[in-house]
Amino acid sequence: MKKILVYIFLLLITNAHSEVTKKITLVAKVNNFGISNIDLLEEIQILKNLNTNLNNTDKQILEKIAIQNLIDEVLKRQEIDENDIKLSDSTFSKEYEQLIASIEKTGVIIDANIKKKIFLKVKLNNEWNQLINKKYRWNVNVNINEIEDRLKDTKNIPTDEKELQELKNKLINIEKNKKLEVFSKIHLSKIKKQSLIKFF
C-alpha cells in the first residue's frame, strides 16, 4: 500500500513539473537570448508595481510595453558587458531601497523574486547611464549664458555665493542629463537596428 502511495505521489509531482515546463514558452529572441512568457508576466507585474495607474491598462498594451522593455534591457545588458562596465552594488543600493520603500508605501506587497528583478533593473540603468556618460560626455555642451539667463528669471535667487553656485551646478547637471538622455535613445536605437530580434 505504501509503495502505491509513493508511486502516486511521484506521478503527481512529475505531472505537475511537466505542466510547469510546458507553460514556459519563448515570446521573443534578441541576438540568441531568449525572452520567455514568464519573463513577460514578471515584467508586467513590475510595471504595475512601479505605476499603479497601469492596473487598469489594456492587457495587450501592457504586454507591448513589457516586451519592449525586456528587449531594450537585453540590448543594454549586452552592450554593457561588451564595454566591460561594472558598478558595485553600493553605488545604487540607496536608490533601490528608496524605490522599494516608495512602492510599499502605496500598500503594494512585493514578493522577493520581483524585488530581485527590480534590483537588477536599477543596476542595469545605472550601468547603462555610466556607459552613455563614458561614450558621449565629451559631446555634451551646456550653454552657460542660457543658465545665467535662467537664473535671472528665477524667483528667490540665493544671495549666498555658495548656494548660488550650487543652484547653478544643479541646472547645469539637469541640462547635461537631458542631452545624455538624447544620446542614450540614439545609442539604443542604433544597436537595435544592428540586432536580430525575432518574435514568436
Language model features with spans:
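Sec-dependent N-terminal signal peptides
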Residues: 4-13
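Boundary at the C-terminal end of the N-terminal hydrophobic targeting segment
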Residues: 16-20
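Peptidyl-prolyl cis-trans isomerase
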Residues: 21-25, 29, 56-200
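N-terminal targeting signals for Sec/Tat export/insertion, comprising classic cleavable signal peptides
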Residues: 24-55
